[in-house]
Amino acid sequence: MKILFTFPGQGAQRPNMLAAIPDREAILSQARAVLGDEVETLDSADALKHTRAVQLCLLIAGVAWARELQRQGVNPQMVSGLSIGAFPAAVIAGALDFASALRLVALRGDLMEQAYPEGYGLTAIMGLTRQRLEALMQGHEVYLANLNAETQIVIAGRDEAMAEVAQLALQAGASKAQRLAVSVPSHCALLDKPAATLAKAFANLALTRPQCAYLSGSTARVLWEPQQIADDLAMNMARTVHWQEAMVAADERDARLA
């Protein structure tokens, strides 16, 4: 059996989430060297209203907790991250250094928030299949964002359009429709331009071949080539997350959660 480390996306954040991370002073010192004094209030409730802070907190926390597992002798043979979680996954795999990840994630958060400062986001729909949900989405400015499970799907778009589709979904038998704590329409074509800008930032950065399998949450494929991983990291904000397929792919490779 192989050990799999997974890293969450936005929605997993909470105030003071960096207060109890392992080896806190050392990792925050590394973050401070890149980000400056911003680190001191990064996980405050006010800061977490912004995409940049949320994504940086998830990166820092993900790396800290994974490194703690490694210190205890638990080393992954495979890593995978959902959305922003792909960045700590790449760091732990050895494909991307932590300092570069901090700079890239800060830019990623800024680009996403600047593109859609308000009025857009994500909504989770539970209890309907993709086929049934897509039929309800017709004529509404919404997109499939995350295919997390057979009947757990996230849509992206304008708040009003998502609310309309959510109501239709509930009327059609969905068990739940929940607006997520994400303020940008991630994982759809609305973020094509910010993703292209982020890709340019990777142009002058040399990633390295990972030391363990890097499983893309977007394509559900294991990537080994540094350029493919760079493309995955840069563009995943504009690509549908195929998390269910990724976890099936991990299972087929005999990988299990640590």
Residue ranges, per PLM feature:
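Alpha/beta catalytic cores of group-transfer enzymes, especially the acyltransferase/condensing modules
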Residues: 11, 37, 93-238
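Flexible, low-complexity segments
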Residues: 61-79, 235-258
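Short, glycine/charge-rich beta-strand/loop segments that flank catalytic centers
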Residues: 45-46, 80-84, 109, 120-124
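Helix-rich "cap/lid" substructures immediately adjacent to catalytic or cofactor-binding pockets
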Residues: 1-80, 155
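A broad detector of short, well-ordered amphipathic alpha-helices
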Residues: 29-30, 60, 64, 86, ...
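A short small-residue
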Residues: 40-48, 88, 176-180
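Short phosphate-binding/catalytic loops that engage adenosine nucleotides
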Residues: 3, 74, 174-175, 255
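Gly/Ala-rich beta-loop-alpha elbow adjacent to hydrolase catalytic centers
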Residues: 62, 77, 81-85, 89, ...
